From Swiss-Prot:
Function as written in the Swiss-Prot or TrEMBL entry: Part of the Sec protein translocase complex. Interacts with the SecYEG preprotein conducting channel. Has a central role in coupling the hydrolysis of ATP to the transfer of proteins into and across the cell membrane, serving as an ATP-driven molecular motor driving the stepwise translocation of polypeptide chains across the membrane.
Signal peptide from the UniProt entry: none
Subunit-structure text: Monomer and homodimer. Part of the essential Sec protein translocation apparatus which comprises SecA, SecYEG and auxiliary proteins SecDF. Other proteins may also be involved.
Keyword terms: ATP-binding, Cell membrane, Cytoplasm, Membrane, Metal-binding, Nucleotide-binding, Protein transport, Translocase, Translocation, Transport, Zinc
Cofactor: Zn(2+)
GO biological process, one term: protein targeting
PROSITE patterns: SECA, SECA_MOTOR_DEAD
Protein name: Protein translocase subunit SecA
Annotated localization: Cell membrane; Cytoplasm
Membrane topology: Peripheral membrane protein
Binding locations of ATP: 85, 103-107, 492
Chain residue ranges for the region called Disordered: 790-814
GO cellular component terms attached to this protein's record: cell envelope Sec protein transport complex; cytosol; plasma membrane
Length: 841
């Protein structure tokens, strides 16, 4: 009965049968399309575009367009998409995620919806995780599109602005997620409209969509300049932390990675730094530096969380095992690690622009994705991106043998067993892929195999340049490859001659990842396109994940049975416990990403407002009306603050108002107290505003309209950019401290939204006030030029594969005066440096 109900109510089955129907319709056109000459096939593109102009939709063209691409693919590449690939293509066109197993031809599948959506002329972005894959796919699949008369662009990190603009102007653009995000941010920092490179975001197809929209979701892309801060405290805090003893002076929680000073540790800190109370407001910075130094020593491990390369601390991505060059830990943690490793400490940077992948990709009109593993994250894709996950059946049934986990008592026993298993398979020539979770594990297994005299390749964050080549060779007879996590995604492991007879590729997992998806990716490397294969995970009671669900009890049970370290157990109960532990961790990670998105949405709304207004500024030929509105708003606020409604008119501070108006808008004597005495606030505003407009007209007559228009743009852009930059910084500080509100029985998110909104309103008011003041009071120089508010921008993000020499991080240009942005200004005005001389330097 339940089976019948499932068939009736399972939406996936209904969706698949609908896709199958479409695939059959496309397949039915095969014979007709085959008869067309190359010229007639190319002509179809022009015909489709004309039909779209006459009012047909892309949905109306789907069946014919897919059939045309299918035939073009056969003629150009020799590959003819299977029916299941047609179904995957329909899923992508509908803005869903096509879950297709490894080796099922995802790249070819994407060509059909990409072509169909590119016919509108609005541009389609095909997104991959690294530049190697973007270049490869643009080269291989681009031939199909060019054969059909569409243009193809490849957007790389090394391109100039003109080359990028050309790449984005193409019908189809191949790029990495990082480059798309950074180009968007850079476009919203340009000073002239002609410098922008992107078009409005229309349709994107993301390859390895789970990696980009889930694993990378919390990673903000940041463009930054540098703030001058002393590095001395990092060195002092590091020297102090080295003297502390674990458990006695500080506590460390493995699960949360939380590090805390004990009472004894606090007393030691106070003695070491010669202060009375570590938590005195004056010692906030010291407290912060000690906390970060402590985290660097206790929670961050070399060759697991980061590696040291060429005198730089480089983060290791815990999901992909790749090095993330150019990306830095925030909040001073990176500097603390540099101090720990005895490296040169680099200054903290000032954020100029930032966005997360979650928010960038949600700006597209339509978004689709493909991957081999997405079903476990179905809820997240549905809730956050409004995308359904559709599991596309394989072209041939899966013949892989997924064996139950083997569980050992200790790590030592487990690794010995792994080395033994690899040795036995190597003896008969069966290729083996060993998957590890950390760089140090891959190096440990490498040592064990060396001792046994087994030649092998190690693929981890330290040598990803040769990644694709190593992975391609991993299916050859006698090949042994050790890979950290899923390095090498996007490259197929094809079986060499005689390997099928040996049982195909053997995949050995050395521990379970906290995400089932990563485990499934590792399994999926074997048994592609119906090939034979075997997968086996080796676990130990000392593994990170096993500790989380109470491995102590199981250890005690094994001791009672007198089990030694060389005998594994195959227990369904333990395997189920591991899976439920993974589900719990996945749930926690989803909640964390969802919460981050709620916080990030506050900044997203503000960013959209600022970027929209900023674009209007650079797009407009005449800003005078916008500037006049700003002046009026600023004036209304000034009048309201000096003539409060709750006070009697005789209590109003008219002297103060006259002084402010003459200082900020008019000149000495521009308005007298007698002019406004006895008038209502509205009348006062009108009178003063009329005089301001007269002065504005005189100024325009003096300098000429053309120079005045450029002057307005210079002022508005500078004020918007400076204030927005400070605002991002302030919002970040607010975000860091807001969780403390939970202790005060308030909802931190609600507080963040309310305070963030108030701060945003204050920022807009500050922009209006300063624009009004500068436009009315500043004199125009002859060499009028728009200029960036901070020189020396750098981008913090992942490296571009195989592009190391281009990766040399540009050191931002520092201002000549070595003074912090929030320090008192050196001119003696009493204002903060950033609000005084720092504004013009």
């Amino acid at each position: 009965m339940l089976g019948i109900l499932n068939k009736v109510f399972d939406p996936t089955k209904r969706t698949l049968s609908r896709y199958e129907k479409k695939a059959n319709e496309i397949d039915a056109l095969k014979a007709d399309i085959e008869k067309l000459s190359d010229e007639a096939l190319k002509q179809k593109t022009i015909e489709f575009k004309e039909r779209l102009e006459k009012g047909e939709t892309v949905d109306d063209l789907l069946v014919e367009a897919f059939a045309v691409v299918r035939e073009a693919s056969r003629r150009v590449t020799g590959m003819f998409p299977f029916k299941v690939q047609l179904m995957g293509g329909v899923a992508l066109h509908e803005g869903n995620i096509a879950e297709m197993k490894t080796g099922e031809g995802k790249t070819l599948t994407s060509t059909m919806p990409v072509y169909l959506n590119a016919l509108s002329g609005k541009g389609v972005h095909v997104v991959t995780v690294n530049e190697y894959l973007a270049s490869r796919d643009a080269e291989e699949m681009g031939k199909i599109f060019e054969f059909l008369g569409l243009t193809v662009g490849l957007n790389l990190n090394s391109l100039s602005k003109d080359e990028k603009r050309e790449a984005y102007a193409a019908d189809i653009t191949y790029s990495t997620n990082n480059e798309l995000g950074f180009d968007y941010l850079r476009d919203n920092m340009v000073l002239y409209k002609e410098q922008m490179v992107q078009r409005p975001l229309h349709f994107a197809v993301i390859d390895e969509v789970d990696s980009i929209l889930i694993d990378e979701a919390r990673t903000p892309l940041i463009i930054s300049g540098q703030a001058a801060k002393s590095t001395k405290l990092y060195v002092q805090a590091n020297a102090f932390v080295r003297t502390l003893k674990a458990d006695q002076d500080y506590t460390y929680d493995v699960k949360t990675k939380g590090v805390q000073l004990t009472e004894e540790g606090m007393t030691k800190a106070e003695k070491a730094f010669g202060i009375e109370n570590l938590f005195d407001v004056r010692h906030v910075a010291l407290n912060h530096h000690i906390a970060q130094a402590l985290k660097a020593h206790a929670a961050m491990h070399k060759d697991v969380d980061y590696v040291v390369e060429d005198g730089q601390v480089v983060i290791v991505d815990s999901f992909t095992g790749r090095l993330m060059k150019g990306r830095r830990y925030s909040d001073g943690l990176h500097q603390a690690i540099e101090a720990k490793e005895g490296l040169e400490i680099q200054n903290e940077s000032m954020t100029l622009a930032t966005i997360t992948f979650q928010n960038y990709f949600r700006m597209y009109e339509k978004l689709a994705g493909m991957t081999g593993t997405a079903k476990t994250e179905e809820e997240e894709f549905r809730n956050i991106y409004n995308m359904q996950v559709v599991t596309i059946p394989t072209n041939k049934p899966i013949a892989r043998d997924d064996r139950p986990d083997l569980i050992y008592r200790t790590m030592e026993g487990k690794f010995k067993a792994v080395a033994e298993d690899v040795a036995q398979r190597y003896m008969v020539g069966q290729p083996v892929l060993v998957g590890t979770v950390a760089v140090e594990t891959s190096e440990l297994i490498s040592r064990l195999l060396k001792n046994k005299g087994i030649p092998h390749q190690v693929l981890n964050a330290k040598n990803h340049e040769r990644e694709a080549q190593i992975i391609e060779d991993a299916g050859q007879k006698g090949a042994v490859t050790i890979a950290t996590n899923m390095a090498g995604r996007g490259t197929d492991i094809k079986l060499g001659e005689g390997v099928k007879e040996l049982g195909g590729l053997a995949v050995i997992g050395t521990e379970r990842h906290e995400s089932r998806r990563i485990d499934n990716q590792l399994r999926g490397r074997s048994g592609r396109q119906g090939d034979p294969g075997i997968t086996q995970f080796y676990l130990s009671m000392e593994d990170e994940l096993m500790k989380r669900f109470g491995a102590e009890r199981t250890m005690a049970m094994l001791d009672r049975f007198g089990m030694d370290d060389s005998t594994p157990i195959q227990s369904k109960m333990v395997s189920r416990a591991v899976e439920s532990s993974q589900k719990r961790v996945e749930g926690n990670n989803f909640d964390a990403r969802k919460q981050l998105l709620q916080y990030d949405d506050v900044l997203r709304q503000q960013r959209e407002v600022i970027y929209k207004q900023r674009f209007e500024v650079i797009d407009s030929d005449n800003l005078r009306s916008i500037v006049e509105n700003m002046i009026k708003a600023s004036l209304e606020r000034a009048v309201a603050s000096y003539t409060p409604k709750e006070d009697l008119p005789e209590e109003w501070n008219l002297d103060g108002l006259v002084e402010l108006v003459n200082a900020n808008f008019l000149d000495e004597g521009g308005v007298e107290k007698s002019d406004i005495f006895g008038k209502e606030p509205e009348e006062i505003t009108e009178l003063i505003y009329d005089r301001i407009k007269t002065k504005y007209d005189e100024k325009e007559e003096r300098y000429g309209s053309e120079q005045m228009r450029e002057f307005e743009k210079v002022i508005v852009l500078r004020e918007v950019d400076t204030k927005w930059m400070d605002h991002i910084d302030a919002m970040d500080q607010l975000r860091q401290g807001i969780h403390l509100r939970a202790y005060a029985q308030t909802n931190p998110l609600r507080e963040y939204q309310m305070e963030g909104f108030a701060m945003f309103e204050n920022m807009i008011a500050a922009i209006e006030d300063d624009v009004a003041k500068f436009v009315m009071k500043a004199e125009i120089e002859n060499n009028l030029e728009r200029e960036e508010v901070i020189q020396g921008q750098t981008t913090a993000h992942q490296p571009k594969e195989g592009d190391e020499e281009k990766q040399a991080k540009k050191k931002p240009v520092r201002k000549a005066v070595d003074i912090g942005r929030n320090d008192p200004c050196y001119c003696g005005s009493g204002k903060k440096y950033k609000n005084c001389c720092g504004r013009t330097e």
